[in-house]
Amino acid sequence: DVVARWMREAGMTVTEDALGTLRGRAGPGKRLLLGSHIDSVIDAGNYDGPLGVIVGILTVAHFHKLGWPLPFGIDVLAFGDEEGSRFPSTLSSSSAVAGIFQYDSLTTSDNHGVTFAEALKVFGKNAADIDKARYNPDDVLAYVETHIEQGPALEAANEPLGVVVGIVGQSRLRIVVTGEAGHAGTVPMPMRRDALAGAAEMVLFVETLARDHARDAMVATVGRI
């Protein structure tokens, strides 16, 4: 509600799509998309996401005061699900905008067994409307996002700004390791099928694999066991 109010105060008309993305629209013609996300994670970096949304709103407010001298319009997007904090999905809000939403993610569930589709209903949304979030590529000039640095590279180089030339693609996997319970003091080591030990080996393998491909900018994280 606060972000929507800021958008209106900046001179935009505001709508919300089926995945909770707020869209502030200003000016006629083809669209320049500005924005970022307003969801977060525990202990996120300061201004992670909101910076890009606020920069977009301030940009529109500036040109609105000038009587809109631009030959194109601006849409400010505030994505509601970038982090995938609740469900094991990736970038669902922006993927819908791009027209590549993965509908199988609607069957995934959170830690309480609530599915993505069920959560949308509680939020007053209809999954059947997700396709309506898509932009026609012919109507879009570009997408620009201002974001905080999420790694230490600029800080280590003592540089205030950087231009991003590429970002990592994101995939999430849920792996189930099934073992066999046995007495801790009497089952011989060669006969053990300890699921936790197997999972630990997998965690170390993922770490090693990413480090071996560090030159390719590969990263990998095991976030939950």
Predicted regions and their residues:
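Acidic/His- and Gly-rich active-site-bordering loop/insert found
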Residues: D1-G45, F63
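Buried hydrophobic packing segments
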Residues: V3, V53-F63, A199-M202, V206
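Glycine-centered loop/turn motif at secondary-structure junctions
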Residues: A10-M12, G67, G124
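General small-molecule cofactor/ligand-binding pocket signal
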Residues: T15, L77, A128
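Beta-strand segments within the central parallel beta-sheet cores of soluble alpha/beta enzyme folds
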Residues: L19, L33, P69-G80, A217-R224
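A general structural motif
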Residues: G29-R31, P71, D139-L141
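A generic, well-ordered mixed alpha/beta core segment in the N-terminal half of proteins
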Residues: I42-H112
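Midchain, well-structured core segments that form catalytic/ion-binding scaffolds
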Residues: D81-E82, R86-I225
